[in-house]
A protein has these predicted regions:
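Central regulatory/effector-binding core of bacterial HTH transcription factors
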Residues: 67-119, 188
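Low-acidity, Ser/Thr- and Arg-rich intrinsically disordered low-complexity segments
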Residues: 3, 9-16, 29-35
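Flexible hinge/capping segments at coil-to-helix
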Residues: 120-132, 136-158
Length: 264
């Protein structure tokens, strides 16, 4: 790999850094073999690190030669909002492909949310914090008030958003101190169906306020603030791996700009 560095430096400083890192890691690994007792876990750990850097180096060289490549995205939250950014990015950069996964392993970028901004990983970037509200039909007795208490929610029939860790976390957190939990009337895994059921007055559900108002969902729905148990979620993105392509940096910038406009 060292022989490639002089050639690559003329084209891409980032590519040079990746290849240099791979070279250094390889030689450190070889030198360390003389100083430690070799164990299978030790070799396995370093092998994975070298393989990961090798893959990053290959992608860096490929990009320096004009290959747009793909962005491997782990999307665990805010799919409704991120899809808007993806649509615009793909329209402007049709040569770039995306692969979407729900697991971060092997991905370049993670988009997720946590209940507190303090829980965001150190190398992650906050995109937006939004309030969790209770979505009810406009015909609901409390719709005109804009507020509801945990006690008042106990008699409601909830529409559960299945297979969503963030929703389950909010639900459990709000009702964890209650002696009973509200009835689950329906369970679905589709935001559009959830909205239709709420608009028909068939139940209520917790929703992220900014995400909800930014989506094309039924208008005859009111959002109620939870007075005695306010909840929020913080959406963030986190680069994964040591290689970040120019296209990924552009996509990250567009993410930041899109969410910045939503916060206004």
């Amino acid at each position: 790999p060292g022989s490639l560095i002089p050639v690559i430096k003329r084209n891409s400083p980032i590519t040079s850094d990746i290849v240099t890192g791979l070279t250094n890691t390889f030689f450190i690994f070889i030198i360390s073999l003389r100083r430690v007792i070799i164990t299978i876990p030790y070799v396995h750990c370093n092998r994975l690190r070298i393989l990961a850097l090798s893959e990053d180096a290959a992608r860096a060289v490929s990009e320096s030669l004009g290959d747009a490549g793909e962005i491997r995205l782990c999307l665990r939250s805010s799919a409704v909002l991120v899809s808007n950014v993806l649509k615009d990015f793909i329209h402007e950069h049709p040569h770039v492909s995306f692969s979407i996964s729900s697991e971060p392993k092997g991905c370049d970028l993670l988009i997720d949310s946590v209940s507190s901004a303090y829980d965001i990983p150190d190398n992650a970037h906050l995109l937006m914090t939004e309030e969790i509200c209770l979505a009810v039909s406009s015909s609901h007795p409390l719709a005109h008030t804009g507020h509801i208490s945990v006690e008042q929610m106990m008699d409601e029939k909830f529409i559960d958003l299945a297979d969503t860790q963030s929703y389950a976390g909010v639900f459990n957190s709000i009702f964890c101190k209650c002696k009973k939990t509200p009835q689950i009337a329906y369970s679905c895994n589709d935001y559009i169906l959830q909205g239709k059921l709420i608009s028909l007055g068939l139940g209520v559900s917790f929703v992220a306020s900014v995400t909800w108002t930014s989506s094309s969902l039924p208008e005859n729905i009111s959002l109620l603030h939870i007075d005695d148990c306010p909840h929020f979620r913080s959406i963030y993105y986190q680069p994964l791996g040591s290689f970040c392509s120019e296209n990924q940096r552009i996509f990250e910038h567009q993410l930041e700009e899109y969410f910045k406009k939503l916060n206004k």
